């Protein structure tokens, strides 16, 4: 080979890991009539160019002892032809034959990059991250990362000794995306990105924002995921997905079991580690299905560095947490759930992210994913960065992650966390600590547009059909579940935080004082049909000193459990879908602790087994009785029979479906049995007592009406017929026409 020039300035910039355009000097280049190959291989002893068949084309001369080599390929190639060669590299302890990463042309389609810059989440999903694939018949990994403010980016990992000089990336300048194909590596490789800010300063090594797999914390590297294996995963849930696509979930029975998967099951014999997805599939899935729940909802499982955040401070929104095993394990978990008749909902956090140095904050030396102004970009309550969802690329990145959960893992629902914090610019901020919108108001117009885009995308052709969206929205923002075409946000369901706060406040009162707080239980019906609601008894209500559900109740242990049973009977009969956090289904005494399992040992006690049995029966009756769910979002599905008996703390109402089927719920929230309580009923004849939360099987006194009551033509409560009931203490009855 002939000598080949290698500019000194280029050498110095490459060795200093600050060259802005490595493809301008590395790889094959025409110099006069010759094709010159230049490489940067720190630590290499000798480099030769070899042909595809293995023959040596020639030696690359070492032009700098730090690892720069250059040489010219033999003549005879047409000017427009890409040279075909490999590099044979002698390292101190091995020889490596590999294609030159800088011999490949541009990787990403310009149209896809333009669509990403315009905010298309499908383009973000297609372009960004690490993808094992073949380029020109050569296996390797394509890396791509959005970092428009960086002056230089390289990919580092085990494959190059974490040397930031080895694999600098190409900038696709109009779009701010850096790309590189690294030959002969594949799925399972650990990697990060080494970036320099615009001023040349080196930044902390950054994990890939679009990584689909990560190391288990506290380690922080990204891992090249085997996306082909996920795409080839042997799903057997076609029938489930077809049924989901045609199901009108708003008028179906929905009862959600909320689970913190890191603590639901731990393996004590192995250092109290969290269970894997496969272990959870064997234990959690049959348990939740056996309890009659329709869905399990998982607190955020996208990789998060701090376990104490319960997943709500994620840095890798595309990657199932490695705490539970590889990504394919989560796919198997969902497959098991669908086979058992359970839907899977995942919590998703597009509002904010933590400040860990390997994460998204100041990713390229600028406020890239967050707002630059701390009045917009820093959350004072959580000490986290606020996503700048008004930036098109950030919105595309986030919504792409939601699409990934729907496509790759077949999840059935996505619950959006902290929506209120996104909707209001002054959320948890004092005067002077927030920036008004362009009209001078407090509404966050960018977040509104983002949430509409999210829902339109998840309900459109880009997503699998039938994926439901849920909003944790704690204010009275109008139209959360209204269609975006009608100026709503477009969610399928909204958590009814007002109902939860009011009813729990009522139940905390000593029964003797409840007459003074009667309206707390009736007020929810004033707005119950303004949105499609979920009634949430979530993790947020059993942490930070709030106490467990059972501990919130007044009285001795028996009365506390009786109160809770009566409350559950009221809740399951009330309009709205149901959600219950783990441990609540058997009335555990301790509040939620992320590093401890639920108090499963309480199930050795008959009283707690009784509450568990009640929740199971409530779920099964709720699913079997269309009157309890078919018109959850319509006034025609509900009517008060007794809403004003504050002196006795008695409530009664009727639920109906559109075929005229009925079920009456009667609640006595005092410890005083009510005998001969005359209740107006909407039909004559025999009414079966289909549920009594005071039943002996549930841990109650077994007071009641012997399984049935008779409605005679005696007017009461505005009805033509009525029956004399015995109302057990602290209990709810359900009656159905026999």
Curated annotation (Swiss-Prot):
- SUPFAM superfamilies documented for this protein: (Trans)glycosidases, E set domains, Glycosyl hydrolase domain
Q: Which InterPro entries match?
A: A-amylase/branching_C (IPR006048), Branching_enzy (IPR037439), GlgB (IPR006407), GlgB_N (IPR054169), GlgB_N_E_set_prok (IPR044143), Glyco_hydro_13_cat_dom (IPR006047), Glyco_hydro_13_N (IPR004193), Glyco_hydro_b (IPR013780)
Report the domain of life of the source organism: Bacteria
**E.C. code:** 2.4.1.18
| Catalysed reaction, written as an equation | Transfers a segment of a (1->4)-alpha-D-glucan chain to a primary hydroxy group in a similar glucan chain
Top enzyme class? transferase
Signal peptide range: none
Q: Name one GO biological process term.
A: glycogen biosynthetic process
What keyword terms does UniProt attach to this protein?
Carbohydrate metabolism, Glycogen biosynthesis, Glycogen metabolism, Glycosyltransferase, Transferase
Recall the GO molecular function terms of this protein's record.
1,4-alpha-glucan branching enzyme activity; cation binding; hydrolase activity, hydrolyzing O-glycosyl compounds
Q: Give the positions the UniProt entry annotates as the active site.
A: 417, 472
Q: Does the keyword Cell inner membrane apply?
A: no
Q: Which Pfam families match?
A: Alpha-amylase_C (PF02806), CBM_48 (PF02922), GlgB_N (PF22019)
Which biological pathway? Glycan biosynthesis; glycogen biosynthesis
User: What GO CC annotations are associated with the protein?
Assistant: cytosol
How does this chain assemble?
Answer: Monomer.
Function field: Catalyzes the formation of the alpha-1,6-glucosidic linkages in glycogen by scission of a 1,4-alpha-linked oligosaccharide from growing alpha-1,4-glucan chains and the subsequent attachment of the oligosaccharide to the alpha-1,6 position.
- Family the UniProt entry places it in: Belongs to the glycosyl hydrolase 13 family. GlgB subfamily.
> What PANTHER family does UniProt report for this protein, alphabetically?
1,4-ALPHA-GLUCAN-BRANCHING ENZYME
Question: Protein name, please?
Answer: 1,4-alpha-glucan branching enzyme GlgB
Q: Which gene encodes it?
A: glgB
């Amino acid at each position: 080979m002939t000598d080949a020039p290698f500019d000194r300035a280029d050498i110095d910039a490459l060795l200093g890991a600050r060259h802005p355009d490595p493809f301008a000097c590395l790889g094959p280049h025409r110099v006069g009539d010759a094709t010159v190959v230049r490489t940067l291989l720190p630590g290499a002893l000798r480099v030769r160019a070899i042909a595809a068949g293995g023959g040596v084309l020639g030696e690359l001369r070492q032009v700098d002892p730090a690892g720069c080599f250059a040489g010219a390929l033999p003549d005879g190639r047409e000017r427009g032809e890409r040279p075909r060669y490999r590099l044979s590299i002698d390292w101190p302890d091995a020889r490596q034959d590999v294609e030159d990463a800088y011999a490949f042309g541009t990787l990403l389609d310009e149209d896809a990059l333009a669509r990403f810059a315009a905010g298309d989440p499908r383009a973000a999903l297609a372009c960004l991250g690490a993808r094992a694939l073949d380029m020109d018949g050569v296996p390797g990994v394509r890396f791509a990362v959005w970092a428009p403010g960086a002056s230089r980016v390289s990919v580092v990992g085990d494959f190059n000794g974490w040397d930031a000089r080895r694999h600098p990336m190409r900038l696709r300048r109009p779009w701010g995306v850096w790309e590189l194909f690294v030959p002969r590596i594949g799925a399972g490789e650990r990697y990060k990105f080494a970036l320099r800010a615009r001023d040349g300063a080196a930044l902390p090594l950054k994990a890939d924002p679009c990584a689909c797999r990560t190391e288990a914390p506290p380690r922080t590297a990204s891992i090249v995921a085997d996306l082909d294996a996920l795409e080839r995963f042997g799903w057997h849930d076609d029938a489930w997905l077809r049924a989901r696509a045609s199901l009108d979930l708003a008028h179906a029975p929905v009862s959600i079991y909320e689970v913190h998967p890191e603590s639901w099951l731990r393996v004590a014999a192995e250092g109290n580690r969290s269970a894997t997805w496969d272990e959870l599939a064997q234990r959690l899935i049959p348990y939740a299905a056996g309890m009659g729940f329709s869905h399990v909802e998982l607190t955020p499982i996208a990789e998060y560095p701090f376990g104490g955040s319960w997943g709500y401070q994620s840095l890798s929104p595309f990657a199932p947490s490695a705490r539970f095993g590889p990504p394919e394990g989560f796919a198997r978990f969902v497959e098991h759930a669908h086979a058992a008749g359970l839907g899977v909902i995942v919590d998703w956090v597009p509002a904010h992210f933590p400040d860990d140095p390997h994460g998204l904050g100041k990713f390229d030396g600028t406020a890239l994913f967050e707002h630059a102004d701390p009045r917009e970009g820093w959350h004072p309550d959580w000490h986290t960065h606020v996503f700048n969802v008004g930036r098109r690329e950030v919105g595309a990145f986030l919504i792409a992650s939601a699409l990934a959960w729907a496509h790759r893992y077949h999840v059935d629902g996505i619950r959006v966390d902290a929506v209120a914090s996104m909707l209001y610019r002054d959320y948890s901020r004092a005067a002077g600590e927030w920036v008004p919108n362009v009209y001078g108001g407090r509404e966050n117009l960018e977040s509104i547009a983002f949430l509409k885009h999210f829902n339109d995308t998840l309900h459109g052709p880009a997503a699998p059909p039938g994926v439901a969206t849920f909003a944790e929205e704690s204010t009275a923002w109008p139209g959360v579940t209204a269609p975006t075409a009608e100026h709503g946000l477009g969610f399928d369901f909204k958590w009814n935080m007002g109902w939860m706060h009011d009813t729990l406040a009522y139940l905390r009162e000593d029964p003797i004082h409840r007459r003074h707080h009667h309206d707390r239980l009736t007020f929810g019906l004033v707005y119950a049909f303004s949105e499609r609601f979920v009634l949430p008894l979530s993790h947020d209500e059993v942490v930070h000193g709030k106490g467990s559900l059972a501990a919130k109740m007044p009285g001795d242990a028996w009365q506390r459990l009786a109160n809770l049973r009566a409350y559950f009977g009221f809740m399951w009969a009330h309009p709205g879908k149901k959600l219950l956090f783990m441990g609540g289904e058997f009335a555990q005494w301790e509040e939620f602790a992320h590093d401890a399992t639920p108090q499963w040992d309480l199930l050795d006690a008959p009283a707690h087994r009784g509450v568990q049995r009640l929740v199971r029966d409530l779920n099964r009756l709720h699913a079997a009785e269309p009157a309890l769910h078919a018109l959850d979002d319509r006034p025609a599905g509900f009517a008060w029979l007794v809403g004003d008996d504050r002196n006795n703390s008695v409530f009664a109402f009727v639920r109906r479906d559109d075929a005229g089927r009925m079920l009456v719920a009667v609640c006595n929230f005092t410890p005083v049995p009510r005998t001969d309580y005359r209740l107006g009923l909407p039909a004559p004849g025999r009414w079966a007592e289909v549920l009594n939360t005071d039943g002996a099987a549930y841990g109650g006194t077994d007071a009641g009406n012997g399984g049935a009551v008779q409605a005679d033509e005696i007017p009461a409560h505005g009805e033509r017929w009525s029956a004399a009931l015995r109302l057990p203490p602290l209990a709810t009855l359900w009656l159905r026409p026999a």
